[in-house]
């Protein structure tokens, strides 16, 4: 019975086990297999879809980028071609429009070139060239003028005149014309016209007239007056005096340096004029060594006497320029020989001169005679002195030999003497005028 029970139990145990095994195993296997297959299929399909979608999407992107690049390149090419086509068309249009304008411009430059060249050739057209609106053209013309002046000055004159001619750019156009004319002329003519710069054209003409009149009066006067003119050149007429002295002197040792000093005189009045006047001053000192030192007139008296020498009042006001020069020059230049009464008796007359000038002259004439009386010097000593020395030309020849050595060794006593003698001149008018017999002559001439 136990066996039966055991078998039945075993069968029962076995059967459910078999069922459980069969049911469990296929269920598990079946489910897993199905799931796996389905999942695999789904996954494959999804993967393929993704791949296809991604591939399509990538292809679309690539296509879009390629088409965009191609479009941009195509647009650029089209724009470049259009610009190339438009540029020549626009250039042609502009050239066609501007065709008359360049013709006018081509016609204008020759005129401007001639306007620039003509001032260099003919100095008469310097003024319109300078009045142009552009400052550059003015500077070019000025530089050309300065270069021409410097070149001609180096060829014709010493280095001192080059510096003076370099400063001629600031002159008026009329004076530039005159300087150009002087450059074209030979060197002798330029020496004769040594100082054309600071003198206006009107004063130049009047100086020439004054020189002609002075030459006529010098022929009438005695050797005394010639010596006085040579020994004491007037500062108001430097041209005439310097030219006469240069022509009469036989030894032209230093003409270039003297002409250079004459031109430099217009710029530096005090220093160079003292050097230039040193030669006649030394002659005057040699003449007056035997006599007392000459009188030194004051500035006003010297101006009035210079006015009496000139032919008319207007020429003296225009030619003589005493305001520019300091009063030291007038005090240094000895004027005793020039203004002696014997010369006035021979040269002056009531017909040749205006009465207004004579009203100014008697003051300095009386002063000259009274100063000689105060110093106890006779009036007749002047011709004796010139006779003893041997004439004015001998003095000039002797003095010229000593000029090269003693031009710059002028004694300082002559500069100090005018200051010491000025109070004497103030006291002179108190002396009575009746003692001089020659003053009666001049009072008669005045009235």
UniProtKB/Swiss-Prot annotation:
The lineage of its organism: Eukaryota, Metazoa, Chordata, Craniata, Vertebrata. Residues 14-25, 35-49, 306-316 have a biased composition (Basic and acidic residues). Keywords: Developmental protein, Differentiation, Nucleus, Phosphoprotein. The modification Phosphoserine is found at residues 89, 122, 200. This is Hemogen. Residues 59-78 have a biased composition (Basic residues). Residues 7-86 are annotated as: Necessary for nuclear localization. Coiled coil: none annotated. One of its GO terms (biological process) is cell differentiation. The keyword Lipid biosynthesis does not apply. The modification Phosphothreonine is found at residue 217. It is found in: Nucleus. Regulates the proliferation and differentiation of hematopoietic cells. Overexpression block the TPA-induced megakaryocytic differentiation in the K562 cell model. May also prevent cell apoptosis through the activation of the nuclear factor-kappa B (NF-kB). GO terms for cellular component: nucleoplasm. Residues 1-91, 137-156, 210-280, 306-337 are annotated as: Disordered.
């Amino acid at each position: 019975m136990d066996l039966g029970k055991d078998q039945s139990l075993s069968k029962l145990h076995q059967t459910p086990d078999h069922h459980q095994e069969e049911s469990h195993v296929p269920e598990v296997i079946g489910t897993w297999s199905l799931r796996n297959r389905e999942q695999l299929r789904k996954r494959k399909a999804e993967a393929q879809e993704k791949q296809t979608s991604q591939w399509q999407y990538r292809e679309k992107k690539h296509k879009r980028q390629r088409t965009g690049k191609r479009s941009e390149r195509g647009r650029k090419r089209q724009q470049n071609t259009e610009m190339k086509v438009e540029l020549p068309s626009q250039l042609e249009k502009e050239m066609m429009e501007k065709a008359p304008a360049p013709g006018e411009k081509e016609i204008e430059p020759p005129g401007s070139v001639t306007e620039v060249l003509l001032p260099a050739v003919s100095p008469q057209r310097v003024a319109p060239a300078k009045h142009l609106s552009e400052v550059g053209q003015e500077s070019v013309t000025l530089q050309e003028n300065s270069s021409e002046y410097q070149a001609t000055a180096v060829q014709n004159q010493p280095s001192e005149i080059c510096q003076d001619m370099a400063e001629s750019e600031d002159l008026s156009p009329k004076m530039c014309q005159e300087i150009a004319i002087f450059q074209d002329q030979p060197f002798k003519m330029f020496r004769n016209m040594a100082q054309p710069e600071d003198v206006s054209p009107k004063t130049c003409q009047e100086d020439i007239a004054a020189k002609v009149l002075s030459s006529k009066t010098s022929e009438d006067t005695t050797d005394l007056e010639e010596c006085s003119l040579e020994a004491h050149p007037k500062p108001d007429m430097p041209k005439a005096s310097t030219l006469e002295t240069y022509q009469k002197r036989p030894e032209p040792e230093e003409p270039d340096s003297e002409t250079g000093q004459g031109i430099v005189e217009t710029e530096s009045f005090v220093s160079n004029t003292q050097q230039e006047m040193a030669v006649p001053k030394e002659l005057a000192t040699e003449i007056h060594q035997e006599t007392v030192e000459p009188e030194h007139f004051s500035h006003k008296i010297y101006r009035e006497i210079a006015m009496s020498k000139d032919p008319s009042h207007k020429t003296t006001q225009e030619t003589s320029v005493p305001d520019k020069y300091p009063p030291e020059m007038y005090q240094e230049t000895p004027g005793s020989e020039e203004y002696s009464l014997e010369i006035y008796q021979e040269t002056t007359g009531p017909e040749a001169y205006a009465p207004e000038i004579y009203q100014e002259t008697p003051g300095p004439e009386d002063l000259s005679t009274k100063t000689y009386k105060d110093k106890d010097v006779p009036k007749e000593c002047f011709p004796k002195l010139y006779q003893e020395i041997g004439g004015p030309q001998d003095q000039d020849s002797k003095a010229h030999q000593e000029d090269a050595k003693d031009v710059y060794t002028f004694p300082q006593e002559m500069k100090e003497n005018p200051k010491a003698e000025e109070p004497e001149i103030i006291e002179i008018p108190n002396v009575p005028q009746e003692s001089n017999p020659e003053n009666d002559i001049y009072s008669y001439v005045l009235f």
